């Protein structure tokens, strides 16, 4: 864990997919940097464990939101709730994602296809729709969305995931293009190979210890979330 530099002191941040992997690592780092966190994930127990870890490390007590991102009405209510409590939002990290089946496109059941699109793409649209007004009330609103090299569509059997990430990239670039005269910046971050549960599911024969841990890429998230970040509409690759 990097030592605190205070770059995010007092910043209010929403992180989705916060209970494990990259989301949990980013949450702990943001807390170490002084941010007040609103953590969203489906798994209550994992959120509570993260809460314990953040407070043990001296971070502010986060707000825990157990929520399935496919409950779009709940995402609408999130914006209203945050507006009432904080009156603004400084940082949005759209990290949550699911892999879906690695199988030929013609074999994918429609409901499975829809689930991957809902979580990886549509939920982020709904988050923007709900939270953009609050980001615009910040002195330096920052939105970061996690994508993947799979968005190129060059990998066989990755259809739903690839399409959902390609859609996410188009969404974020369109959103960023609308932000030119505002104080909000929106960017994409592609983590590359990282030691996560999703990576293990996608590449079961790979040695996890050969991959960098999620903590190794957290500096990039801090850079993109900080008030002094001037990047907008970019796809930033972790190297």
PLM segments and residue spans:
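Active-site loop of short-chain dehydrogenase/reductase
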Residues: 11, 59-60, 88-89, 135-149, ...
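Conserved glycine-rich cofactor-binding loop
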Residues: 12, 19-20
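Conserved glycine-rich Rossmann-like NAD(P)H-binding loop of the short-chain dehydrogenase/reductase
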Residues: 33-50
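The beta1-alpha1 cofactor-binding region of Rossmann-like NAD(H)/NADP(H)-dependent oxidoreductases
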Residues: 45, 66-77, 110
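Catalytic loop of short-chain dehydrogenase/reductase
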Residues: 98, 110, 136, 141-181, ...
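Substrate-binding pocket helix/loop in short-chain dehydrogenase/reductase
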Residues: 103-105, 109-114
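C-terminal helical subdomain
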Residues: 181, 188-189, 196, 205-239
């Amino acid at each position: 864990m990097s030592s605190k530099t205070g770059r995010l002191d007092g910043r209010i941040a929403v992180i989705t997919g916060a209970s494990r992997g990259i989301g949990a690592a980013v949450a702990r780092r943001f807390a170490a940097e002084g941010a007040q966190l609103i953590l969203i994930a489906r798994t209550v127990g994992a959120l509570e464990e993260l809460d314990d870890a953040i407070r043990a490390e001296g971070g502010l007590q986060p707000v825990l939101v157990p929520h399935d991102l496919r409950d779009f009405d709940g995402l609408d209510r999130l914006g209203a709730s945050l507006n009432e409590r904080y009156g603004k939002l400084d940082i949005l990290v759209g990290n949550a994602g699911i892999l879906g089946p690695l199988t030929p496109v013609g074999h994918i059941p429609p409901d499975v296809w829809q689930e991957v699109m809902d979580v990886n793409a549509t939920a982020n649209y709904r988050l923007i729709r709900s939270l953009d007004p609050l980001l615009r009330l910040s002195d330096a609103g920052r939105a970061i969305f996690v994508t993947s090299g799979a968005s190129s569509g060059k990998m066989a059997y990755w259809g739903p995931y690839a399409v959902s990430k390609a859609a996410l990239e188009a969404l974020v670039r369109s959103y960023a293009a609308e932000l030119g005269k505002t104080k909000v910046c929106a960017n994409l971050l592609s983590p590359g190979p990282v030691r996560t549960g999703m990576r293990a599911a996608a590449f079961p024969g790979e040695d996890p210890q050969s991959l960098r841990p999620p903590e190794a890429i957290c500096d990039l998230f801090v850079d993109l979330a900080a008030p002094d970040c001037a990047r907008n509409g970019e796809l930033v690759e972790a190297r």
